[in-house]
């Protein structure tokens, strides 16, 4: 990486502060062309990691802003290269003019995620940490941000490194046995190796098991609202969103198709799916809507079963209950608590663990519903940030787990060292893909292309 890159690192609309970022061997030379410090010293003589007041110049040397400049000499920088930032007033024209001046001084426009890619290639971050940068930028909830920053801090990386180092040490012993056939694995060594494989298998099983939670954390919990027509599903959707998203009328069967929206409830990101009321005998369009409701329930992790508290249970309610019972997590919301109660809530409490009263019309009980949702997906289960959050990570972890299980089984039944070694090598290769020690260049390019320009 012999060139120097530059980019605007802040959003492209007027704001209080805008930042120009650059990284590469010619950082100081580029700064001297566009920045004139008030203390008169060139960039290379400025104190590292200290803000310096000065003027930002355009390509002709005209002053365009009063700015602060901070320099991060290699290797103690984000990318591991010489880096700098120019903190300007957040005017798009100032930032664009400053960026053009940096290009005129020899910098190149940074590609998407190129600063983070350079950090990875220079060993400042491993691939898991680099991926967490994009997760942190895209975080919509405190849970998402917490998990991303834990991974950026190395929580997941340390878990993978511990597994990798244990397997590498064991593989080294097997190499010695394979290279020198007269050597043999003593019983004590065999037990130690089996223990290493057992711990590796347990750690990998925990990572793989956490993937489903990691995906829910990242993408949002698919949450389906189920109930008979006119139970108040759309009203509850609107109440949770805080605005009118779905059409609400007194006419049963108003909702014909699924309506989807994202909302953070109790710190949990939900992908709310309002569905057509569950009943038989509707027209062709309504029947199609009911089928889509059933399909949505199959994909959901949480069901909010909405019952009309002003009426007794009907066959249509029981049909909705049967469908809701197929979803892993279930909360029963007895709606219309502002009206006279006809539904036997005590009988419902005998059938379900989570039954609560709400009024979508007045907002009564929504706080209790929010708490119930948060209790289903508590932040405390985040395992300190050691959560796989994308399919690439899960695939590599699954392959590593399979190889470790094969190695453990082969060693237990006394297979020859070369067989066990082959499985260990497969596990190490998969773990190398997971943390970036062994990864294809095209995959690296794809991963970093998803990160925003300037990061």
Locate predicted features.
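Short glycine-/small-residue-rich Rossmann-like dinucleotide-binding loops
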Residues: 241, 276-277, 301, 308, ...
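A glycine-rich (often HGG/GG-containing) alpha/beta subdomain
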Residues: 1-146, 150, 154, 328-331
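Inter-motif core of Ras-like GTPase G domains
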Residues: 286-310
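Structural motif
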Residues: 89, 307-310, 336-337
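Generic enzyme active-site microenvironment
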Residues: 272, 306, 333
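Switch I (G2) and immediately adjacent beta-strands of P-loop GTPase domains
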Residues: 53-65, 69-73, 253-281, 299-302
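Short alpha-helix of the ABC ATPase nucleotide-binding domain corresponding to the H-loop/switch region
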Residues: 278, 286-290, 318
């Amino acid at each position: 990486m012999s060139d120097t890159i530059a980019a605007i690192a802040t959003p492209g609309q007027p704001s209080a502060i805008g930042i120009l970022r650059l990284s590469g061997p010619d950082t100081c030379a580029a700064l001297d062309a566009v920045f004139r410090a008030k203390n008169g010293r060139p960039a290379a003589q400025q104190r590292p990691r200290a803000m310096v007041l000065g003027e930002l110049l355009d390509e002709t040397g005209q002053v365009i802003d009063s700015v602060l400049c901070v320099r991060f000499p290699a290797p103690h920088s984000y990318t591991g290269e010489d880096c700098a930032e120019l903190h300007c007033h957040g005017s798009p024209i100032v930032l664009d003019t400053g960026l053009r001046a940096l290009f005129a001084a020899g910098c190149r426009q940074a590609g998407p995620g190129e600063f983070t890619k350079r950090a990875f290639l220079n060993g400042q971050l491993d691939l898991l940490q680099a991926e967490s940068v994009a997760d942190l930028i895209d975080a919509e909830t405190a849970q998402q941000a917490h998990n991303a920053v834990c991974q950026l801090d190395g929580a997941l990386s340390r878990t993978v490194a511990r597994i990798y180092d244990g397997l590498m040490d064991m593989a080294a012993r097997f190499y010695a046995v394979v290279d020198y056939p007269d050597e043999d694995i003593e019983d004590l060594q065999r037990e130690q190796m089996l223990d290493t494989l057992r711990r590796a298998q347990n750690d990998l099983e925990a990572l793989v098991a956490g993937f489903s939670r990691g995906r829910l954390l990242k993408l949002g919990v698919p949450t389906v609202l189920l109930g008979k027509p006119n139970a108040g599903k759309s009203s509850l959707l609107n109440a949770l969103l805080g605005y009118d998203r779905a059409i609400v009328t007194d006419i049963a069967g108003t909702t014909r198709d699924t309506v989807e929206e994202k909302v953070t409830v109790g710190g949990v990101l939900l992908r709310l799916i309002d569905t057509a009321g569950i009943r038989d005998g509707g027209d062709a369009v309504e029947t199609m809507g009911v089928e889509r409701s059933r399909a949505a329930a199959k994909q959901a992790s949480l069901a909010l079963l909405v019952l009309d508290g002003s009426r007794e249970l009907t066959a249509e309610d029981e049909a909705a209950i049967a469908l809701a019972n197929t979803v892993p997590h279930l909360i029963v919301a007895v709606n219309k608590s502002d009206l006279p109660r006809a539904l036997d809530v005590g009988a419902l409490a005998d059938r379900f663990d989570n039954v609560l009263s709400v009024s979508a019309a007045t907002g009564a009980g929504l706080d209790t519903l929010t708490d119930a949702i948060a209790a289903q997906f508590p932040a405390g289960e985040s395992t300190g940030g050691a959560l796989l959050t994308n399919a690439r990570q899960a695939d590599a972890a699954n392959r590593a787990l399979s190889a470790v299980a094969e190695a453990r089984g082969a060693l237990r039944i006394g297979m020859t060292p070369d067989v066990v070694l082959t499985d260990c090598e497969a596990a190490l290769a998969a773990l190398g893909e997971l943390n970036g020690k062994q990864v294809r260049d095209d995959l690296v390019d794809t991963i970093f292309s998803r990160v925003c320009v300037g990061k």
